[in-house]
Amino acid sequence: MDRKTRLSEPPTLALRLKPYKTAIQQLRSVIRALKENTTVTFLPTPSLILQTVRSHCVSKITFNSSCLYITDKSFQPKTINNSTPLLGNFMYLTSSKDLTKFYVQDISDLSAKISMCAPDFNMEFSSACVHGQDIVRESENSAVHVDLDFGVVADLLKWIGPHTRVKRNVKKAPCPTGTVQILVHAGPPAIKFILTNGSELEFTANNRVSFHGVKNMRINVQLKNFYQTLLNCAVTKLPCTLRIVTEHDTLLYVASRNGLFAVENFLTEEPFQRGDPFDKNYVGNSGKSRGGGGGGGSLSSLANAGGLHDDGPGLDNDLMNEPMGLGGLGGGGGGGGKKHDRGGGGGSGTRKMSSGGGGGDHDHGLSSKEKYEQHKITSYLTSKGGSGGGGGGGGGGLDRNSGNYFNDAKEESDSEDSVTFEFVPNTKKQKCG
């Protein structure tokens, strides 16, 4: 009887439990908050990477070879979701103090076989792999490189913490709500953090802050992301590295590391909000002439807009389409929008029959037909009490003895029809052509 050939074990990546438990206990508060947007990647380096993607921020925690070992370098990289059915937060399960064994086997390109053991408990399952998941990498090219002592990180957390709470009735600020602006000055080296409400905190070069690369720069990032970044880095209780990378897009890189793991955060820049110089509604002065009061009765000529010399039907439509300001018809009152030049109120009429405040007796030059047409146009616009005349600027040129000239139909009229004429408004006739 031939002995069966023992099958070789597939490539396996396992945890070194003692250093891993030391590391995971430091990160327990961070890992507890991980949600569905987190992936877990097992690499043949060996290393284990947790990557969380949020809006304008990517956080990465890398466990190095001090916490892991591998049986075969042919182990293919595996990426799974941290949120698994039935189990929930996968990495939080590995933070249990009762864990006695944990390993991952490479048996398929489509899944990862995972085994977890505890006293009187053994669990083995397969988790589908996530394909096309890129791991963000650190770039060595940075315009600014600043090292912050752990005490500085703690000061920043105390300063930012109260501002991360949601407040009501927040007034519009010069930069977007919930952002922090980071200013770096080259001479002398200094870094300043400015919040939306104007509060700021500045650090200069000393034994707590070291500047390795300095350039005048400014970057704006979300406040909640920056606060969470500092919390992630504070778990090491070691100095924190802050760098501004401008290789492609402007990024804020914040990281802290110890002998077991590294915490890295990549924050993308928020756009600066600038005041729009065209956001105010500009109102021109051209519309202010309608209904405006004034003395002197200075009237604009209608000759440019068709004039009153046309006896055709188009004149009625032209004037009915736009109400006339009647302040200047009786003399010195304030002018309207479209005003005619036959009344020289205030001595400034365009038809100079006489120079002076009264406007002269230029009405004798008008024919009966012109006066009739003028009366037909304007009589329905003013009451018979003569309310159109204003007492301004020298008595008014067309307000002769007692009332508005156009309302006094008997004066110098050669037609009996004009004496008894009464205008009756008709909606059909007032429609625009």
Curated annotation (Swiss-Prot):
Domain of life of the native organism: Viruses
Crosslinked residue numbers (Glycyl lysine isopeptide (Lys-Gly) (interchain with G-Cter in host SUMO1)): 410
UniProt region (Disordered), positions on chain: 274-433
Subcellular location(s) of the protein: Virion; Host nucleus
Gly residues bias (residue ranges): 289-298, 325-336, 344-359, 385-398
Keywords linked to the UniProt accession: DNA replication, DNA-binding, Host nucleus, Host-virus interaction, Inhibition of host innate immune response by virus, Inhibition of host IRF3 by virus, Inhibition of host NF-kappa-B by virus, Inhibition of host RLR pathway by virus, Isopeptide bond, Phosphoprotein, Ubl conjugation, Viral DNA replication, Viral immunoevasion, Virion
GO molecular function: DNA binding; DNA polymerase processivity factor activity
Effect of residue 135 to A: Complete loss of interaction with UL54
Residues annotated as transmembrane: none
Stretches with biased composition (Basic and acidic residues): 360-376
Domain note: The C-terminal region is required for viral DNA synthesis.
Quaternary structure note: Forms homodimers. Interacts with host SMARCB1. Interacts with host NCL/nucleolin; this interaction is important for the organization of proteins within viral replication compartments. Interacts with UL112/UL113; this interaction is necessary for efficient viral DNA replication. Interacts with UL84. Interacts with the uracil DNA glycosylase UL114. Interacts with the DNA polymerase catalytic subunit UL54. Interacts with host IRF3. Interacts with host RELA.
Official protein name in the record: DNA polymerase processivity factor
Organism the protein comes from: Human cytomegalovirus (strain AD169) (HHV-5)
